[in-house]
């Protein structure tokens, strides 16, 4: 199937707040979508809705873990803060979370350390391999797989995903790797959202 190029008008109709960066991202997105067969308006609309939500309409390419509310931290990051593994937020856990407020690096190392190829909390891998790009590639193992697919050294240079070209390519690779175009073809929009964000955060926004 021939690639149907995305136009600036179409991109701004879906993501109106991306106007300041549209000149950088339009060619990058066209290259990425052509490479990974996001090649119909239905596929493109679904893809753009997802990356628009994940990246605040192409304006946020690196995850911020700067929080000021300890209870919110304990609620969001069960892996690092459900200390007694009971599935509830307890006062002791909220108190423990206070030590991670207003410190993105410390919090990332806590919640992402020791998982999916990351070294332990003290290694710094949690922050090094935090979510980046338009769809939030996270963890050493996913950086490695994505880098191998794209032919770029993402493990050694994870910050490459903060550049428009690789931010777009990594998102399109993730889409292709999870067979999300098939779901878009079938109109399974919630199924796509579940793959990208299992908690369903922002589902209504993605549908707009």
Predicted regions and their residues:
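Peptidoglycan-targeting cell-wall enzymes and recognition modules
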Residues: 2-24, 52-173
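Solvent-exposed, polar/charged alpha-helical surfaces in well-ordered, non-transmembrane soluble domains
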Residues: 9, 27, 31, 45-48, ...
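Short, mixed-charge amphipathic alpha-helical segments
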Residues: 34-39, 156-162, 184-185
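Surface-exposed patches in mature extracellular/periplasmic domains of secreted proteins
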Residues: 37-47, 60-64, 181-193
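Acidic helix/loop microenvironments that form the catalytic cleft of cell-wall polysaccharide enzymes
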Residues: 51-54, 184-203
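Proteins synthesized as precursors that undergo proteolytic processing into mature forms
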Residues: 166-170, 177-184
